[in-house]
Design a protein with these regions (language model features):
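A short SAM/SAH-binding and catalytic strip from SAM-dependent methyltransferases
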Residues: 127-143
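Class I SAM-dependent methyltransferase SAM/SAH-binding core
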Residues: 60-117
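Conserved alpha-helix/loop element of class I SAM-dependent methyltransferases that forms part
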Residues: 31-60
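A short acidic, Gly/Pro-enriched loop at the edge of an enzyme's catalytic core
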Residues: 119-129
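Short alpha-helix
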Residues: 214-237
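Conserved class I S-adenosyl-L-methionine
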Residues: 158-201
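A short glycine-rich, Lys/Arg-flanked "PGG" loop and its adjoining helix->strand segment in the class I
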Residues: 143-158
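Acceptor-substrate binding/catalytic loop of class I
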Residues: 163-178, 206-222
């Protein structure tokens, strides 16, 4: 490994610094991507995509991986689930615990790397593993992630994932045109995509001190294969034309706090969702 090449663990540590810094910015967000005041008034933060696919979660034990500061975790708790949220940012976990106390919702929150989720949360203890929106692009190894999710589930338990479509992750926009810019697959430290950004995708325009981060693109074929090899049976795979944030400049507001490309623009799917069941 070259002297200036970071390991995957070091790259994730760089990302954690950025996510630590993003927490207060996102809590103060008034763009609608994170609506903390609305949540505190009783609004549910789950989007129509998740709402139509996860079913009744009342009484279910749910592990929410990469939960950020817990809005979706607490929305699941509001629906009657027993929720444990896991995130690698201590700032996020502290904020999530504060929101749980403020709302009186009984979710628990644990700080830890998602790859160590079984050590933090225990094996085979959950009816559902829930993962949503901007999660797996931060992971260098999708097969390892799928194996962890599978080990958290009881036999017959379900994984639910809704996230950015990998085809959109490959694109940048130049003069209103979509341009394939990034490879369809990146894995591990050597293939990590390095980015620099001055501001977060949500918030009040605050300038970030931690500007660098790393991302990884996992094609749908790799995700589905990882689930199968990890002991999960695919139940459904859906593609969507809406996303909870404007992933590229041409995306416009859509119903339910989502964003999409204009009708006249030829564009790929921007999101996908899937459900899978742990094999007995």
């Amino acid at each position: 490994m070259a002297e200036d090449e970071l390991s995957s663990e070091a790259q994730m540590a760089v990302n954690r610094l950025k996510w630590d810094e993003r927490v207060p910015i996102h809590i103060a967000d008034r763009t609608g991507i994170y609506d903390v005041p609305g949540f505190l008034r009783g609004n549910d933060t789950l989007k129509s995509i998740e709402d139509s696919e996860i079913g009744d979660v009342s009484g279910r034990r749910i592990a929410h991986l990469q939960c950020h500061f817990g809005l979706d975790s607490l929305s699941l708790a509001r629906r009657g689930a027993t929720v444990t949220g896991l995130d690698f940012s201590q700032e996020a976990v502290t904020a999530a615990k504060g929101l749980a106390e403020q709302t009186g919702l009984g979710a628990e929150f644990v700080c830890g790397n998602v790859y160590d989720a079984v050590e933090h949360l225990g094996p085979a203890g959950f009816d559902m593993v829930y993962v949503s929106w901007g999660a797996i692009i931060w992971l260098p190894d999708i097969a390892r992630w799928a194996a962890v999710a599978s080990r958290l589930l009881v036999p017959g338990g379900r994984l639910y994932l809704a996230d950015l479509h990998p085809a959109l992750a490959q694109l940048e926009e130049e003069d209103g045109k979509l341009v394939f810019t990034y490879p369809r697959r990146s894995h591990g430290s050597r293939e990590a995509l390095k980015f620099h950004e001055d501001q977060s995708y949500a918030g009040n325009g605050a300038v970030l001190g931690n500007k660098q981060h790393f991302e990884w693109i996992h094609p749908l074929s790799d995700i589905v294969t990882a689930l199968h090899e990890g002991g999960l049976r695919l139940d459904f795979l859906h593609e969507h034309d809406m996303l909870p944030w404007p992933g590229l400049p041409s995306m416009v507001p859509a119903p339910d706090g989502m964003y999409r490309f204009p009708d006249q623009m030829i564009a790929p799917p921007v999101a996908f969702s899937l459900g899978a069941t742990a094999r007995s």
